[in-house]
Amino acid sequence: MKITVLVLINVAIATAFLLYLRKPGRISYYHRGRVWLTWLSIAVITLMDELTSVFYAPAEAYRFIGPSAIVFIAFTAFFIHYMTTRMVEIAEILEHHGLIGGGVYSFSYLVLGPMVSFVAVASIMVDYVLTACISSVSAVLNATSFFPMFHTANMVMVLGIIWAIAGMNILGIRENARFTFAVFIFAAFIFLNLIASGILDLDGASVARLKEGAHHATMRLQTGSWITRYDVFIASIASCILAYSGVESVLQTAGLVRSWKEIGKAYIFLALTVGLVTPTVAALALSAPIDFSLHEGDLITYYATLVNGKLFGIVVAGLASFALIMAVNTAFVASSELIERVAHRYGFLWMIATNRRQSLYRIHILNALFFSSIILITQGSQMILADMYALGLIASFSINMGSLIIYRYFRGTKDVIPFNTNRVITLLIWIVFVSCFIFLAIRKPHGTMLWASVTGIVLFAGFLVAQKRAPEIKEIEKTDSEMDLILSLAQSSAPEVKLFFLRPREMAWGTAKDNEAYITFYSPRQGTPHKLAQNHFRLALAKSDLYSRILAVLKVVEYEMPDRQVTVYIGWPMSSWLDRISIGVMVFKLMRLPRLFPNFQFNINYPGRGIS
């Protein structure tokens, strides 16, 4: 019966792929002078990266939380893939602002500015470093599952993989979407056969272990006070989060597709594939009669041997090693693109010099040296690398969610209406991630040391660079000053001075008068707005908030023009105060101005659209 079922499954898989691929344009297509990838292509690229986690994450989760890993790996799958709806929202926001690609770094730069965005750079770099390191170690452990070797030989092979991938990238040899899709087809056959075989081989003992896992998870969550239960909940998610590493990679590929909507489709595909395959394979493997302490590095490979024999185990080991090596290559490519983006933004052109094959060879060499140093420091220990990896991964998620909350606080949903998520739920997700980060920082000293060290170094370098090379410096140089405003108003002999505070995109006013000044505050990260008239003054929000800058302007006017009657005009806020909470906070602050400047007149008005 088992053979019959497997034959039917394989025929169904082959038929499905043949029917789907018969139509052209399923992987890539040509539009307006450029080749674009489809949503399926970028989903498969991320899938092959994310799916590699199944070869090491279940064993790591079991090591920390025992049988309840069966339940929490499944719950974490739902939690993480629900969180990806926020990634889609971020992709939409980035596209709205013309920031295509760059993912976490571009979004954190937009929201948090150059200094804090270096924390995101550090977290992402830690992810890429540890992706390369743990994938190369796991690739060797799976490859040598049937041919045990000495630790020194394993270390040589791990370093060999890293430098071989570096050499391929230096020579300009790159994988493409079609090659990745071919590997995905092969992986689909292997994993579906593994799942089907595992389900058919379930016996009473395996079912009992599954029930034990559910009971163990329930008992842990029902013991002690609510604080203890929350601690158990956070510890369990933090221990399973590694199973879904790489899920953020879709956001990094936004520059390869035409619209943010393709990102949304890709995340739905990942939820229906990796979101189901990973917890299913993990549950089957963790319910099998295996001594997990002896098979932390090759759990899935050994489980495949149990259900379908040694030959199938060798095939799974081959797939695992090949997919993990592809993940190493992904880490090289992604980290080089991130460093290139940062170097280009801050003018370090020597770092992004290319060779004859258009390869960022200097960055690849630096990456290989850094990856190798981490392997040597950790002695190729999958356990230590996993501890480090989880911390950096959760740090990136926390920065993403925090940046989104801050963006929505200030901007609401008016700018990007088609797709937006519930901010309260986003806040709850952020709280969970921050709690996981705190838990791992306390319990995983190796990961904490690495993340803190790299973050500290990058932040220090970022501080030095941002002081002299930040793109905002050129934009700030274009700004007007308060004294320009005063000198302009001083040319008027009128007894009254009128100050109009404009939003960056407001343009309409009547004939300009010499006793009037129109003031626009802008963020240097979004560029200097166009000067609309001689009495239009653009002031940068560099190191202070909007209210503080308004206060500073009014104090200068009060000091320099004590004999003039000053009238201040502020536009009526049209945004919903619930949608843009910052509007309500701003209006509350503006209510203080009459007390601070009792001799000024203040008007918050709406001019109306007129009658046609």
Regions found by a protein language model. Name each.
Residues 2-21, 31-34, 59-109, 115-123, ...:
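Extracellular loop-to-transmembrane helix junctions
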Residues 5, 9, 67, 480-612:
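Cytosolic C-terminal regulatory domains/tails of membrane transporters and channels
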Residues 16-23, 185-220, 282-289, 400-414, ...:
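Hydrophobic alpha-helical segments and their helix-loop junctions in multi-pass secondary transporters
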Residues 50, 55-58, 120-141, 239-257, ...:
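Membrane-helix boundary/coupling elements in multi-pass transport proteins
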Residues 351-362, 397-446, 476-478, 484-486:
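C-terminal membrane-solvent junction of multi-pass transporters and transport-like membrane proteins
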